[in-house]
Amino acid sequence: MVDRKGKGFRRKTRDKLSKHPRQRGKLTITRILQKFNNNDKVAIVIEPSWHYGMPHPRYHGLVGTVVGKRGNCYEVELEFNGEKKLLIVHPAHLKKVG
């Protein structure tokens, strides 16, 4: 084997992108079809079984604001390392906060 570090999208995410046994199975349709309004606060909680519109795992657990909609996904603005970021995230990976 070659001692070379992997550089893929899902590297170092064994715990972050895995579910506990009781949470496994099909994703509920209500989670996929959630609706959000502009200026809603949302948390990015990646759903590992739904790959469409998945943000990079470095943003897992962060809170942002919905700015708009792009197709089936939402534009979420958040601050990361002192910079404003605009992520395009599917609603399966979002949870409303407060």
UniProtKB/Swiss-Prot annotation:
One of its GO terms (biological process) is translation. The keyword Ribosomal protein applies. Coiled coil: none annotated. InterPro entries: Ribosomal_eL21, Ribosomal_eL21_arc, Ribosomal_eL21_CS, Ribosomal_eL21_sf, Translation_prot_SH3-like_sf. Residues 7-23 have a biased composition (Basic residues). SUPFAM superfamilies: Translation proteins SH3-like domain. Keywords: Ribonucleoprotein, Ribosomal protein. Gene3D superfamilies: Ribosomal protein L21 (2.30.30.70). Residues 1-23 are annotated as: Disordered. PANTHER family: 60S RIBOSOMAL PROTEIN L21 (PTHR20981). This is Large ribosomal subunit protein eL21.
